[in-house]
Amino acid sequence: MKILIAAIVFSVIVLSHELGHFLLAKKNGITVIEFSLGMGPRLLSTERGGTRYSLKLFPIGGSCMMAGEDDDDTSEGSFNNASVWARISVVAAGPVFNFILAFVFAMIITSVMGYDPPKVLQVTEGSPAWEAGLREGDVITEFQGKNIVIGRDLDSYMTLHGLQDETISLTYKRDGKKQDITFRANSESKYMLGFHYASEGEPEILQVMLNSSMQKAGVQAGDIIREINGVEVKDSAQLQDYLKEHPLDGSEVKLGIERNGKLETISAKPQMTKQIDSGFVYNVYREKTNFLGVIRYSATEVRYWISTTIESLAMLVKGQFSVNDLSGPVGIIDVMGDSYEAAKKEGAVMVSMQMLYWAILLSANLGVMNLLPIPALDGGRLVFLLVEAVRRKRLNPNVEGMVHFAGFVLLMLLMVFVMFNDFRRL
């Protein structure tokens, strides 16, 4: 079932992307030879208005094949016969349509589920945050210099960056008035493995912290702890009791991890970690909003995923993420399947919302990735077209073709590497 759902989600996202290229090509008088969904041999095909419309065997990818797109053809109706700005609009339309699709899906989710206001749910009385004036019900609008619109903006900051320093600066709104505060949070250093697990039931790992001992040992969210230092663990309460009785002291810890029904043993050495307590708890739950709010927060939803994708890419370039952390279609399908299984317990509406949520994430992600200035991607083609617009002369087509081919080969090698990692993690 999860493969079918993932295929539908991927197909809709790719169809939207290729539809953008298709509509702008038609608008600019460029002949579209074939518009297809999927890859491989054709299952269904029909020709209308000089364009062949095809459904292909493998529901991954798609294409909008335009006349003269990859050669020197400058005859009437060919891609190269169109003006440079017409070609720029055609190439850019794919990613733009991905953002539009993400916005449409975000409107559905926000209409049904609402948005997550960045409200303060609780402030520890007597903490530095309390002494600085922060109270329950305040709405955070800025945190450590980052603009905050929804609760997940705060959540994203905490996940990607954490609190690196005890000094916290934030802006909150109360009764329509904004107030800036700065306080020095409480902190303590202790040995930690770097993970969060479910508070009840099976001790399933919910999150593995970046650059932690657990991440380096290969532990993943979704793994279940069955043993710790040879002691059997039946539930989260038992794991919690063990850790209270045997505080981590820097000695190596052996864990029995269950993944997809298979048990494996890993070793991880706790690291001395400074824990900074902000002194307050913020909201990540959704609440209803009015029509204008739906529009505003739907745009915010798309902006959130675009900025999160860009920030994650920047961290990858800086070495804060490893290429081993990347997931391809196989890994995404697996995680989507887990989301589906969790959501179906709450009914069809929640399943629909969860899959739309994934569609927003993936559509925004695809839009950003395609705009990267990498040969063979839309962004790489846009670079050549913008240079042509400035020079008022096209670059050597053979050189451009070789650059895009080299980029395509490198992307395929990266895809093989990522898929290998996906299968290794299953």
Tell where the protein language model's regions lie, with residue ranges.
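Terminal peptide-recognition signature
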Residues: 17, 55, 94, 129, ...
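Internal alpha-helical transmembrane segments
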Residues: 58-125, 406
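Juxtamembrane extramembrane loops of integral membrane proteins
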Residues: 69-70, 77, 82, 121-187, ...
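PDZ/PDZ-like domain segments forming the peptide/carboxylate-binding groove
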Residues: 103, 109-142, 146-149, 188-227, ...
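Small-residue-rich helix-interface/hinge motifs
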Residues: 2-75, 369-391
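Juxtamembrane boundary at the C-terminal end of a transmembrane helix
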Residues: 416-426
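Alpha-helical transmembrane segments of multi-pass membrane proteins
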Residues: 10-14, 65, 98, 102, ...
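Functional transmembrane alpha-helices
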Residues: 78, 82-85, 192-216, 221-227, ...
